[in-house]
C-alpha cells in the first residue's frame, strides 16, 4: 500500500464515521424532542399536580431541570412537534424501548410521511420549519420535496417562503 492510499483511506473512513455519528445524534435528538413534547402534553392533560404549576409549567420545568438547551422555548417547540407529528410515537417507543406511546390525536394517514423515514431523512431543524405549516398536505409536500431534492434548511425555508407548494 502506498502512503497516499493509506492517507486517503484513513481520511475516507473518518469522514464516513463522522457523518454517521452526526446523523445518529440528530435522529436521537429529534426523537428526544418528540418524547419531551409527549410528556409535557400528557402532564398538561392528566397531571395530578398541574394546578400547582399552571401557566408557568414550562418555565418551572426549565428551572427544575437546569440543563443547557432544555429551556422554555424548546419545550414549546417540542410540545408543538408532538401535536403535529403524533405518528412518531411508535419510532420513539421502539428506539428508547418505552411502552407504546402510540398516536394521541387523529391524523389522516393519507398524507403522513412514514415516521421512520421522516426521522431518518430530515433533521429536527427541517421538521421545525415544516411543522409550523397548518395544512397536513402542505407539510407532506415539503417533507417529500425536501427528501427528494436533498434541501438544506436554508433552501427549505426559501421554498416555503416563495410558496413552492402553491406554485407546483
Predicted regions and their residues:
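Basic, low-complexity intrinsically disordered segments
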Residues: 1-168
Amino acid at each position: 500500500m502506498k502512503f497516499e492510499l493509506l492517507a486517503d483511506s484513513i481520511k475516507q473512513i473518518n469522514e464516513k464515521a463522522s457523518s454517521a455519528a452526526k446523523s445518529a445524534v440528530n435522529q436521537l435528538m429529534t426523537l428526544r424532542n418528540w418524547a419531551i413534547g409527549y410528556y409535557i402534553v400528557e402532564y398538561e392533560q392528566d397531571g395530578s399536580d398541574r394546578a400547582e404549576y399552571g401557566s408557568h409549567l414550562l418555565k418551572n420545568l426549565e428551572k427544575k431541570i437546569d440543563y443547557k438547551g432544555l429551556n422554555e422555548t424548546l419545550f414549546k417547540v417540542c410540545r408543538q412537534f408532538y401535536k403535529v407529528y403524533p405518528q412518531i410515537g411508535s419510532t420513539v417507543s421502539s428506539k428508547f424501548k418505552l411502552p407504546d406511546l402510540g398516536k394521541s390525536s387523529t391524523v389522516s394517514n393519507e398524507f403522513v410521511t412514514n415516521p421512520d423515514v421522516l426521522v431518518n431523512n430530515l433533521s429536527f431543524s427541517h421538521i421545525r420549519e415544516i411543522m409550523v405549516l397548518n395544512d397536513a398536505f402542505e407539510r407532506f409536500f415539503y417533507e417529500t420535496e425536501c427528501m427528494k431534492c436533498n434541501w438544506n434548511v436554508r433552501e427549505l425555508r426559501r421554498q416555503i417562503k416563495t410558496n413552492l407548494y402553491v406554485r407546483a
